[in-house]
């Protein structure tokens, strides 16, 4: 059984969650646009990052769980809001650091978040 490390704190209502995720997706999209080898497409709340080799990293919201989900070649990851940042529900790793690592592994180019 999957044990969650992160719980929303403070709890977000649905509107706050959507606003927070929209900001996250926009930030990821800006980071992808600053690269040479990762294209981004945001449609219907799903952000697709396409690498030069045609592989994809998908970032989307999971509203009922108040999580951000990331699907990549290396696996699936769930992030929940905890202590002021988005944390992997299994490892506790921070979302933007994880995405940078995932992009470096998959696309050969990390995402830089400033």
Which residues does each PLM region occupy?
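N-terminal intrinsically disordered, cationic/polar leader segments
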Residues: 9-114
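Short, Lys/Arg-enriched N-terminal segments with co-localized hydrophobic residues
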Residues: 1-11
């Amino acid at each position: 059984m999957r044990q969650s490390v992160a719980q929303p704190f403070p709890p977000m209502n649905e509107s706050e969650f959507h606003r927070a995720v929209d900001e996250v997706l926009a930030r990821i999209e800006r980071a992808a646009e600053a690269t040479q080898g990762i294209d981004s497409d945001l449609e219907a709340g799903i952000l697709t990052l396409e690498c030069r080799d045609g592989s994809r990293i998908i970032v989307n919201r999971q509203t009922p769980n108040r999580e951000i989900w990331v699907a990549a070649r290396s696996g699936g990851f769930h992030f929940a809001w905890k202590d002021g940042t988005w944390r992997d529900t299994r490892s506790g790793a921070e979302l933007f650091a994880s995405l940078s690592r995932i992009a470096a592994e998959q696309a050969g180019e990390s995402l830089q978040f400033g």
